[in-house]
Amino acid sequence: MEDFIHLHVHTYYSILDGQSPVQKLVDKAVANGMRGMAITDHGNMFGVKELFNYCNKINGKLKDEGKEPFKPIFGCEMYVAHRRKCDREKERGDMGGYHLIVLAKNYNGYKNLIKLVSRAWVDGYYMRPRTDREDLERYHEDLIVCSACIAGEVPAKILKGDMQGAREAIEWYKRVFGDDYYLELQRHEVKDPHQRANRETFPLQQRANKELIELSKEYGIKLVCTNDCHFVDQDNAEAHDHLLCLATGKDLDDPNRMLYSKQEWFKTREEMNDIFADVPEALSNTLEILDKVEFYSIDHAPIMPFFPIPAEFGSEEETRKRITPEELFREFTTDENGNEIMSHEEAEKKIKKLGGLDKLY
């Protein structure tokens, strides 16, 4: 059996889409003998601190047992704008974007990932928080990227018959990310004939996979396999289906509503080996990615804004002791004899300017 870890995982921080508690994912991975795992929520990094804290707790126990530590990988499934992140024309397909798995190798990569995600929300939001090639190239250092599900740029273009476009995308990502770019395979086959589930995705995945395997040979790019995990155990599939109804505002019995394949649980190493037995390198390459990732801390002291204090106010401690809100207003609104020289509104403006807050209000 090939060793394997999950690199494409949605927690309950993929709002109204992922259902998995972070702690249950880690517990299942550790119990199954996995050496680590990534979380890659849609467009956000809300779960990284919870993952970091819980892995630290688990690793304390593993150390006491003489076992190797469990390695967290901080990532995000980002949306890459079809053109530029500043473009916002619905009729030209600017809503949403291609999916891309982005993983941080170390603390510098973590900071670059934070930058990408923040800019996607602040500058690129249009239906979804979107990044673009310009930002990916600018902040590419110490990041690992995988081509994602069939909504990723390369598989999406393959399925449209645009092999020239797929090759162009591969060449661009390989130029920017080098050996840290991987082509991703997924297989969500529904085997239960009585289960109500999405059966259209698997044939599309197989079509894309066939070309991805050939392209990996052509360009010398390594393969990885993932499962696009959205819930912890197979038994959670129906509960996850209810969650999708909440997300889309549909009834369970709606014949036209969105369905998942119900294969998106956090599968064991054994289950993933059964599914990808014909491409063992795609399993083992997940460990290559794990070995590229460092253990590092994301803890940080509180970041407080700096407010300059006039010399006549004394030290920060003296200022805190001296000034209550009422005294602060008297300081600005009255003269040394207690006569009012400034209105309340004028005092507020002056205080905001003194604190560097005038641009925020």
Regions found by a protein language model. Give the residues of each.
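Phosphodiester-processing cores and adjacent nucleic acid-binding clamps
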Residues: 1-361
